[in-house]
């Protein structure tokens, strides 16, 4: 855990707009960035649990193919990459 001095320095850097916690982008303080990072991590884990490992991997594969001008599905089609969207369904 960071000491009080380190926390204060990190908080000052965060207030200047710097991301000091991985995944804490957008937080205006050290504590806010910690909370954002924790929530984003938990959200991703929940989504993985809902979709299952295979569905989560397929969704990541599709998202990784997206570009500024084309969504991942179109790009995958052009490249001949097979994405099984049936695995995107949440488990009940």
From Swiss-Prot:
Residues 1-92 are annotated as: Disordered. Induction: By abscisic acid (ABA). It is thought to provide protection for the cytoplasm during the desiccation stage of embryo development. GO terms for biological process: acquisition of desiccation tolerance in seed; response to abscisic acid; seed development. Residues 1-18, 37-51 have a biased composition (Basic and acidic residues). This is Em-like protein GEA6. InterPro entries: LEA_5, Sm_Hydphi_plant_seed_CS, Small_hydrophilic_seed_prot. One of its GO terms (cellular component) is cytosol. Present only in nearly dry and dry seeds. Belongs to the small hydrophilic plant seed protein family. It comes from Arabidopsis thaliana. Pfam families: LEA_5.
């Amino acid at each position: 855990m960071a000491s009080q001095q380190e926390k204060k320095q990190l908080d000052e850097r965060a207030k200047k707009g710097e991301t000091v916690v991985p995944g804490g982008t957008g937080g205006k303080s050290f504590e806010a960035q910690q909370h954002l990072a924790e929530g984003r991590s938990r959200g991703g884990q929940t989504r993985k649990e809902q979709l299952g490992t295979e569905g989560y991997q397929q969704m990541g594969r599709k998202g990784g193919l997206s570009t500024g001008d084309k969504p991942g599905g179109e790009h995958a089609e052009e490249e001949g990459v097979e994405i099984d969207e049936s695995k995107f369904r949440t488990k009940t």
